[in-house]
Amino acid sequence: MGLSIAWRLAQCGCPVTVYDRGEAGRGASWAAAGMLAAAVETEPGEEKLLTLALESQRLWPDFARELEAASGISIDYRDEGTMVVALTRDDAEQLRFTYEFQKSLGLELDWLSGAEARRREPHLRPGIPGAVLSLRDHQVENRLLGSALAEAVRRAGVMLYEHCPVHEVDIASARACGVVTDRGYDRADVVVLAAGAWSREIGGIPRSHLPPVRPIKGQMLALRMDLEMPLLRHVMWLPRGGYLVPRRDGRLVVGGTVEERGFDDSMTAGGLLTLIEGAWRAVPTIEELPVVETWVGFRPGSRDDAPMLGSSGIDRLIMATGHHRNGILLTPVTAGSISAYVLTGRLPECAEPFTPERFLNARVGAAVRSGLVTAPEAR
């Protein structure tokens, strides 16, 4: 997320420095699946998040073209759409309920019979009772996205320090003044905290103002399809939250577990079994495909599973974290919103419900009275 914000700010003429704890573009975005599923992922209670997601989805085609031109790297934006399948009658009943809810929000979705779904995806298990198709929920190759953003920021003149984690944000006179890294101390007019699942690991920030972000572990794997006869065209969502994402290079990405296990990066037998069994129940012919890669990523989950965008409650310290499962989808709108906030002190209307201030509690009063921080205000 930090790279996209840096790119937008550099385009506006701002001098920007990015500090990455690893190799640029190889954090949570590298471990993701690249789904831009604003419609089919929407659940009751997420109406405000849907507004933000739809705006970002609207921005994505132009964002992709602009980034490819700026970096010289294709990010393989694909618009075949997303299919959610039901494998049993119970699945179909639940899917119908979700479909009706999503349609009530004005989302463009189509209910497919099992036969219609199999005409579109012949390798689906015979006898499935139904599916939902969203032609607006696209995908992007997230690893190429990370590489393209890293190249774009370099070409835009951003100073990019890799394998250089920020240890501490310097806060003096109730405002952020700079950062401490292995390089030493660097002053800053504004600090944007976009550290994903590691956002609470940054020192110097009063505990009352640390973002309530935790790592949510996800195990994933990739299978190798025949390039001449790929098994799937659409992104495929499964009844219990798994998904299959076909890539043009022949990989079939299978994801992803959702585990509250801190930063445990081990692949487990149970995790692999869950992924493979879920995929096999929908597309039995995957049993013939070789496994070519397994990996673990950490989604940055907030207390309400929605992002934190804007004022931290400390002057000149801005948050862009907590995107959970929607980091790739929300990249364009986050980059635009945070760059606008840095430059004008205001968020776009669609981002206003997601300020970190919604989590500030009574401890802020004590911090303000002690002089560590000031009351939240826009720049």
Report each predicted region and the residues it spans.
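Dinucleotide-binding Rossmann-like beta1-alpha1 core, especially the glycine-rich loop
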Residues: 35-120, 278-280
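Short beta-strand to alpha-helix junction loop
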Residues: 51-54, 85-94, 132-151, 266-271
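Hydrophobic/small residue at the entry helix of a nucleotide-binding pocket
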Residues: 1
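Short loop/edge segments at beta-strand edges and connector loops
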Residues: 113-114, 162-164, 293-295
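Active-site substrate-recognition segment that forms the wall
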Residues: 4-12, 18-21, 34-36, 40, ...
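C-terminal catalytic lobe of FAD-dependent flavoproteins
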Residues: 283-379
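Helical element adjacent to the flavin cofactor pocket in flavoenzyme catalytic cores
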Residues: 131-190, 194
